[in-house]
Every structure is written in structure tokens, then in C-alpha cells.
Amino acid sequence: MAYLADTHVLLWASEEPEKLSKKARKALEDGARPVWFSIASVWEVAVKIRLKKLKLDGSITEWVRALQSHGFQLLPIQPSHTETVSVLPLHHRDPFDRLLIAQAMGEDLEVITRDRAFNRYPINVVW
């Protein structure tokens, strides 16, 4: 089973790796299992930059390229993912995280996240 990294995990991996748990760090470094990042995370970063809640050292495009150069794979949003979002229980209110949960369910991915609300859904969480 491959991994899907939550947005904060992607940011911490590149900017503040000391914030990652040992299990999260190990999962990110496990070359035998692919690590995906969602286009929804890229969108979330763009929104946070616009709201001045986040600043990257370079552009969003440079950040995405850096992730890809480290072996992370970009996961697009499929219509089936949005269909799943429409029926998910409202345990989690963040629309970006709800989409990540739907993607994890649809693509059979384990999610690397510190967010405990993910545990309320039928997915495997690594932290």
C-alpha cells in the first residue's frame, strides 16, 4: 500500500523535518512504497499563500518540482474522489482534508498525517 502525505507533512518534510514523527519520517523515506501528494494540497498551499498564512521560499511550481525530484508523486483529483466527498460523514470540516480522505479511500492509500480527525474515517493513518 502506498502513502498519501497530508499538506502539513509535505511542508514540514521540506521546511521543518524535526516536526515529523519517527513513523512519518520512516514512511516518507521508505523507497519501497510510493508517496503521493494531492493536487488538493497544492491548491491548499496556494490559498494559504494568498491569505498570507503561509510563505514558501520559492514559487508553488518550484515547491511541486522539489517534491517530485524527491520522489513524491502528484495525485490528481478524479470525479470519483469528489463523489466520495459528497457522502463522507462530517467528522472533519476542512474541505481540503475531506478530499484527501476521499482520495485515500478511493486509491487505497495510507495517509501520513498528525490530524487525529482522519482516524474517524475508514482509512489507515500513519503518525
Regions found by a protein language model. Give the residues of each.
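Short, well-structured N-terminal submotif of metal-dependent ribonuclease cores
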Residues: M1-F37, L51-R65, S69, E107, ...
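Phosphate/NTP-binding elements of NTP-utilizing enzymes
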Residues: V45
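Active-site neighborhoods of divalent-metal-dependent phosphate/nucleic-acid chemistry enzymes
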Residues: K55-T61, S69-R114
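Active-site regions of enzymes building and remodeling cell-envelope glycoconjugates
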Residues: P122-W127
